[in-house]
């Protein structure tokens, strides 16, 4: 279910303040965050945000197409290595 329009999009305050400080100083550096739930705002465009996936921080470069999505969408938490192969074929 989508978030109510009257509530507006959510972004963690600490993340927004870090991005605003970088924008004022015209700096582009990697910002580490654990906030996968934050919505990507237009102010984030051009920055690289390292999003935590439960194991490590995955660097995500923010482009225009990502605005409105959540940060967690771009840092997958599960690694899929494929199903086990069928050994019957290799035995012959």
UniProtKB/Swiss-Prot annotation:
Gene Ontology CC annotation, any one: small ribosomal subunit
One MF term in the entry's GO annotations: structural constituent of ribosome
Top-level taxon: Bacteria
Keywords for this protein: Ribonucleoprotein, Ribosomal protein, RNA-binding, rRNA-binding
Keyword Ion transport: no
Stated role: Protein S19 forms a complex with S13 that binds strongly to the 16S ribosomal RNA.
Protein family per UniProt: Belongs to the universal ribosomal protein uS19 family.
Listed name of the protein: Small ribosomal subunit protein uS19
Source species: Bacillus licheniformis (strain ATCC 14580 / DSM 13 / JCM 2505 / CCUG 7422 / NBRC 12200 / NCIMB 9375 / NCTC 10341 / NRRL NRS-1264 / Gibson 46)
Encoding gene, per UniProt annotation: rpsS
């Amino acid at each position: 279910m989508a978030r109510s329009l009257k509530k507006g999009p959510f972004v963690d305050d600490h993340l927004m303040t870090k991005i605003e400080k970088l924008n004022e100083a015209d700096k582009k550096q990697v910002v580490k965050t654990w906030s996968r739930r934050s919505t990507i705002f237009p102010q984030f465009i051009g920055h690289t945000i390292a999003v935590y996936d439960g194991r490590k921080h995955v660097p995500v470069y923010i482009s225009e197409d990502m605005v409105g999505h959540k940060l967690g969408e771009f840092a997958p938490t599960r690694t899929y290595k494929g199903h086990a192969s069928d050994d019957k074929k290799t035995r012959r």
